Amino acid sequence: MNKFKNIAVYGGGSFGTSLASLAAQNCNNVTLFLRDEAIAKEILHNKTNVKYLGDIKLPAHLQATTNLDIIKDFELIIIAVPSYAFDDSIKLLKTHSISKDNTLLIATKGFARNPTTLFSDRLKTLLPHSPTAFFVGPNLAKELAKNLPASASIASLDIDIANKIAYNLSSKIFTTNVSSDIVTLQVAGALKNIFAIKSGIDLARKQGENARATLIVAALKEIAILSKALGGMQKNSDILLEGVVGDLVLTCYSLGSRNTKFGYELGISSDKKQFLQEYKELVEGREALKLVLDLIKKYNLHMPIISEVASCVIPYVIPAKAGMTYESTQQCLRRNDI
């Protein structure tokens, strides 16, 4: 199978930088595209991105630039921007002549906005001719950058594209599998951050490890509910992909996850209203909640865990409850139609 002769990563945060480091393990021509000139120079000269990854050393041959004029020359372009910036990022890349000659690998997790939809649906409008795949896996950015063992799922409607990307990213310590179910991977990648918020709250409320493990099972059911509504889950085995159950477990169990950390700090907060008003760090699950509620309403779905997290995090949308309970998890587990 052919290798990509060069790989670009668009997005210079912790995840984008770690993906560039991962890609550079198998490719000698990898460039990280970012907006911050100072960070680009730091990566070029010091091989670090201290702001996002501390003192972790990046591969010696990894390049960095702010010059988007050359991104069209890269065969594989990995998109690793926050979900709120996805549309604007794709539109910007389009102005720099991205075409069918560029394969896109979407590593952003969440939903496109205005209207709420899957990234794959938005790309049909913005870049309909570019080959596209999706990257989802149990990947903490710092561990990826340290070259520790990990895995991911690569999904594309064109399984040959998925296989080629998997071949280019796989190594002795990084395992990939491929799937054609782009819907389930996108849904799981967005919802897992919301479930991680509940996991953090459960941890703060000392609900116990049994409850947190049970949450994983219930969360998988809610992922299946939304995925089926959007046309995914043609095979029940799709739920077992690394990018679904693996990413969910990691995000819900690690305090290295921003979403679990946010849920935990919300849970121990004495003034939750003030906490929510003053919390400035980006929490993707918090961003995704309102968008998921749009989809729940549109498709008339019953997803009690999502609704309960929303009542705690955005109480002006759903009336606030006294506190997070085990009830929503039980409601989901009682369903046998999934």
Swiss-Prot record:
Predominant place of localization: cytoplasm
Q: What are this entry's molecular-function GO terms?
A: glycerol-3-phosphate dehydrogenase [NAD(P)+] activity; NAD binding
Q: Name one Pfam family in it.
A: NAD_Gly3P_dh_C
Question: Which species does this protein come from?
Answer: Rickettsia rickettsii (strain Sheila Smith)
Q: Cross-referenced InterPro entries, in alphabetical order?
A: 6-PGluconate_DH-like_C_sf, 6PGD_dom2, G3P_DH_NAD-dep, G3P_DH_NAD-dep_C, G3P_DH_NAD-dep_N, NAD(P)-bd_dom_sf
Query: Gene3D superfamilies given for it?
Result: N-(1-d-carboxylethyl)-l-norvaline Dehydrogenase, domain 2 (1.10.1040.10), NAD(P)-binding Rossmann-like Domain (3.40.50.720)
* HAMAP family xrefs: NAD_Glyc3P_dehydrog
Enzyme Commission code(s) on record: 1.1.1.94
Taxonomically, which superkingdom? Bacteria
Q: Binding residues for sn-glycerol 3-phosphate, per the UniProt record? A: 109, 137, 192, 247, 257-259
- Pathway info: Membrane lipid metabolism; glycerophospholipid metabolism
Q: What GO biological process terms are annotated to this protein in UniProt? A: carbohydrate metabolic process; glycerol-3-phosphate biosynthetic process; glycerol-3-phosphate catabolic process; glycerophospholipid metabolic process; phospholipid biosynthetic process
Location comes to: Cytoplasm
Q: Where is the signal peptide?
A: none
What is the protein name stated in its UniProt record? Glycerol-3-phosphate dehydrogenase [NAD(P)+]
**Where on this chain does NADPH bind?**
14-15, 35, 109, 141, 258, 282, 284
Q: Name one GO cellular component term.
A: cytosol
Protein family membership: Belongs to the NAD-dependent glycerol-3-phosphate dehydrogenase family.
Keyword annotations: Cytoplasm, Lipid biosynthesis, Lipid metabolism, NAD, NADP, Nucleotide-binding, Oxidoreductase, Phospholipid biosynthesis, Phospholipid metabolism
The active site annotation covers: 192 (proton acceptor)
Q: Which reaction does it catalyse?
A: sn-glycerol 3-phosphate + NAD(+) = dihydroxyacetone phosphate + NADH + H(+); sn-glycerol 3-phosphate + NADP(+) = dihydroxyacetone phosphate + NADPH + H(+)
